[in-house]
Amino acid sequence: YLQPSAIQFDSVNIDGLTTDQVAQVCEHIPELTGLISNDSLTELLKVPFFIEIAVRAIGNGAQFRTGDTEVDFRNTVWATVISKEADRKSGMPDKRRATFINIAKQRAKKMLFGIRASEFDPEVVAKLEEDHLIHRDQRSATISPMHDVLEDWALEEYIESEYIENSHDLVNFLLTIGNEPAISRAFRLWLYRKLKSDD
């Protein structure tokens, strides 16, 4: 966007944290210590976003254990931050999960910056907004996931559910998920994880 518009800009590369810096963070937040026993999770925690989301998960009751894998980490974050399993009133975890996935899916399918908030249960939207999982644009009355990583995870969840539903007919599976740019990216991530876990 910037180059074709002849806007002057400079690129700034920001490195992740070092292993020593991650260890220092874990000294201050001992609940994270179990995560650094796994090399792949140490690499993950070099990205400050993952430390922040892990701390949010811990605040919601998550317990990370020595030996947790990247899949365990992701499942724990999904259960405690996105679904927020601790708040079970009115079936809220399932509603939160379904709404978050649907927001990401619709945004990807329609290739829009935001989706009209009026299409979703206002109570669920308010809860996701309170937890800083979605952003509301007051001017356009639209919502979108707040974090790219969580949006990718939501799209992978959508793809996984369609795969389970259509595993007997892979052509229909591929037609159902579509090939929009965000879906294609999420499909590559989903397929990589599938192959990595030999599932």
Question: What spans do the regions from the language model cover?
Answer:
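Winged-helix-like regulatory helical subdomains adjacent to P-loop NTPase cores
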Residues: 33, 58-125, 137-144, 148, ...
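Conserved small helical "lid"/interfacial subdomain of P-loop NTPases
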Residues: 3-37, 53-59, 74-85
